[in-house]
Amino acid sequence: MSGTWMTVRAWLLMLPLLVVMIAVIGWPLVDTVGLSFTDAKLVGTAGNLVGIDNYVKMVSGSNFQRTLITTTWFAIISVAAEMVIGVFAALLLNQDFRGRAVLRALMILPWALPTVVNATLWRLIYNPEYGALNAALMQIGLIDAYRSWLGEPGTALGALIVADCWKNFPLVALIALAALQAVPRDVTAASLVDGAGPFARFRFVILPYLAGPLMVALVLRTIEAFKVFDIIWVMTRGGPANSTRTLSILVYQEAFSFQRAGSGASLALIVTMLVTLLAVAYAALVRKSAGSAA
């Protein structure tokens, strides 16, 4: 069978999927691009053509800049914490001890639960009147009065980061745990015989096997954290005083709360471009890793 026919056959097999992708992704994207160059409202007339004014106003506006900083801090801190906690949990659950299977199953639970459920549970924990966190901190003497952790600008973002880490660190742990299964036990045993300590054993024996999978987890979690919406919307709706407003929430507010469809479309495309840059960086890292391995 000729190479040309194989290529044609491959495209024919992919054609139904391409049609679906164009219908579901392509056309709405084209429509959004067109909408972003207008001053259209969510209801009413189609709006007038304004060129790149929406993009200029969005990028140069203080709301966008503050929100971008908040989103970046949220992504950096939450992903870093998830990576550290996830790797530590994987190393712990890779040991042989009674009840390991039960702990592995329980660890998956926060990640398996719907985000709305997780967010609701954490709202109850942070509740300023009867929340478990306030009660525990009062018992050990760290606070002398109940606090509104989600109602104060100084603590709201940190409280959200904790909830997000709780939700997503199991994914990192599962990826790391799967990679740990590939570490040869004879190599680990040899390092023990050679007198390698825990840190040296992790650095020179275990980490090389974890590097590739952890890079995948790092990039995927960074992309997800950068476009986070659901857990923040359920817990704070971007408040108080916009201290927890992320880019995705700003897009929602611009398009639906303020009913500025044109501005919302331009902002959505800006966020899409930022996330695409992260995806391109991920692809470049994968190619570089594959080239190094070859």
Predicted regions and their residues:
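Cytosolic juxtamembrane amphipathic/interface segments immediately preceding
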Residues: 1-2
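A structural signal for multi-pass alpha-helical bundles of membrane permease subunits
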Residues: 6-294
